[in-house]
Amino acid sequence: MKGAVFLDRDGVLVREIVLDGEARAPLRLEDFFIVDDAASQVERLHQAGFRCVVFTNQPEVARGLLSQPTLDEMHRRLSEATAVDEILVCPHVDSDGCGCRKPRPGMLLEAARRADIDLRDSFVVGDRWRDVDAGRAVGCYSILIDRPYSNCSTADASVPDLTSAVNVILARGEAPPE
C-alpha cells in the first residue's frame, strides 16, 4: 500500500469564478483556468512518490447546468496540463444521498480500493469544509487552502496556497515505497 494526495479541483487546481459575490466552479470551457503552479506542484508530489488524485463535487451536472462533454473536456485539459493520475467526480446533489458526494468519503474509498492506497498515509488538500471532512472521515491528513469562503476550522493544517500545501506534505515525509 502507498500514500496518495487527494486534491480538490475548484479553488485548488482550477480557478473558481465569482458570480453574485460567491466563488463557484466554472461551467464553461472559456472560464476554465488551471492555477499557475498546479503542474509544478503535482510534479513535486510525483517526485516524492505520491499518487495524485483529483476528487471533485460537480452538482451542476445533475442540475443540468454543466454537460458531461464539457466536464470531460475540462478534465482532459486538467489531466494534460498537470499529469494527475486520476480524476474522480461526484455529479450528484446533496438530496441524492449518494456516498460519493463530499463530505462523505466515497470517492476516497473508491480510489483507495482501485489503486491500493493507504488512506492513513495520505493527504487531502481542499478549500472547503467538505474536502477536509471527507479526508478526516477516513484518516487522511487534511490541509485547507484558506480562502475567504472556506469556513472550516477542523483541518490538520491551514495554508494560503497550493505550493504551501505541498510544502507541508513534503515536510511530513515522503510517500512510502510501492
Language model: regions and residue ranges:
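Active-site neighborhood of HAD-like aspartate-dependent phosphohydrolases
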Residues: M1-R51
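Asp-based, Mg2+/Mn2+-dependent phosphohydrolase catalytic module
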Residues: G3, Q68-E86, S95-V124, R128-E178
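Active-site flanking residues adjacent to catalytic metal/cofactor-binding acidic residues
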Residues: L7-R9, T56, G126-D127
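Anionic group-transfer/hydrolysis microenvironments
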Residues: D10, P59, R104
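Conserved protein kinase catalytic core
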Residues: V14-E16, G21, R63, D133, ...
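Residue-level signal for short segments within beta-strands and strand-turn junctions
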Residues: R15-I17, P91, D146
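Flexible, glycine- and charge-enriched loops at secondary-structure boundaries
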Residues: L27-V35, G64-Q68, R101, A155
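Substrate-recognition element of Asp-dependent hydrolases with the DxDx(T/V) motif
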Residues: A38-H75, V84-D96, G135
